[in-house]
């Protein structure tokens, strides 16, 4: 899925609150030229649309800044929002090289219906995401785990996950991800 966002360089000496009142969300792009960072603004509608399509530290985003010669891909590194109003406050992007290795977090999704649940057991998920290493062009959105063969009293470990090609697991392979426990009567 191709996701992109249009940004502008942030005007100097303007309060972030004033920008938000104008419908602009302050943002920053890290790592586009070594250690240099650049202050940006994103339209609020564009930012909200972006966040519906992309997830933090998982989706590559084409960041376009017309005032800069740099164009490239970035990960959304951080999203700041008001704790209860849910208003968007700030976005942080981290520039990535298409062929450079990244350490990222990927969610785990169970597929299938476990044999143990058909026998009256309950499935418990202990780990919701795993740390992996891969190149930027090969980031999986989710890692699916087939639980259909698990019976009551059995479990699946992180080491049992089937990683997509080019993706390396960074977590302890002996950590339990799913287990089927007998239901209390």
Curated annotation (Swiss-Prot):
One Gene Ontology biological process: translation
InterPro entries in alphabetical order: Rbsml_bL25/Gln-tRNA_synth_N, Ribosomal_bL25/Gln-tRNA_synth, Ribosomal_bL25_b-dom, Ribosomal_bL25_C, Ribosomal_bL25_long, Ribosomal_L25_dom, Ribosomal_uL5_bac-type
Transmembrane segments: none
Any one Gene Ontology molecular-function term assigned to this protein's record: structural constituent of ribosome
SUPFAM superfamilies on file: Ribosomal protein L25-like
Alphabetically ordered keywords of this record: Ribonucleoprotein, Ribosomal protein, RNA-binding, rRNA-binding
Tree of life domain: Bacteria
Family matches, as Pfam families: Ribosomal_L25p, Ribosomal_TL5_C
Keyword RNA-binding applies: yes
GO CC terms: cytosolic large ribosomal subunit
PANTHER family: RIBOSOMAL PROTEIN L25/GLN-TRNA SYNTHETASE, ANTI-CODON-BINDING DOMAIN-CONTAINING PROTEIN, RIBOSOMAL PROTEIN L25_GLN-TRNA SYNTHETASE, ANTI-CODON-BINDING DOMAIN-CONTAINING PROTEIN
UniProt function note: This is one of the proteins that binds to the 5S RNA in the ribosome where it forms part of the central protuberance.
Subunit annotation: Part of the 50S ribosomal subunit; part of the 5S rRNA/L5/L18/L25 subcomplex. Contacts the 5S rRNA. Binds to the 5S rRNA independently of L5 and L18.
Family, similarity comment: Belongs to the bacterial ribosomal protein bL25 family. CTC subfamily.
HAMAP family per UniProt: Ribosomal_bL25_CTC
Protein name: Large ribosomal subunit protein bL25
């Amino acid at each position: 899925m191709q996701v992109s966002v249009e940004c502008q360089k942030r005007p100097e000496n303007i309060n972030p609150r004033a920008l938000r009142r104008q419908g602009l969300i302050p943002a920053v792009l890290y790592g586009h030229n070594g250690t240099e960072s650049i202050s940006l603004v994103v339209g609020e509608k564009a930012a909200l649309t972006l966040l519906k399509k992309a997830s933090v530290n998982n989706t590559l985003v084409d960041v376009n800044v017309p005032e800069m010669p740099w164009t490239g891909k970035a990960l959304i590194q951080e999203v700041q929002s008001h704790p209860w109003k849910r208003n968007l406050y700030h976005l942080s992007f981290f520039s990535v090289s298409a062929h450079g290795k990244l350490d990222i977090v990927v969610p785990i999704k169970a597929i299938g219906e476990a044999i143990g649940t058909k026998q009256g057991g309950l499935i418990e998920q202990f780990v919701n995401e795993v740390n992996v290493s891969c190149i930027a062009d090969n980031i999986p959105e989710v890692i699916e785990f087939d639980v259909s063969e698990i019976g009551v009293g059995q479990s699946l470990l992180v080491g049992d996950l089937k990683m997509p090609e080019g993706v390396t697991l960074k977590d302890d392979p002996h950590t339990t991800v799913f287990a089927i426990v007998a239901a209390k009567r």
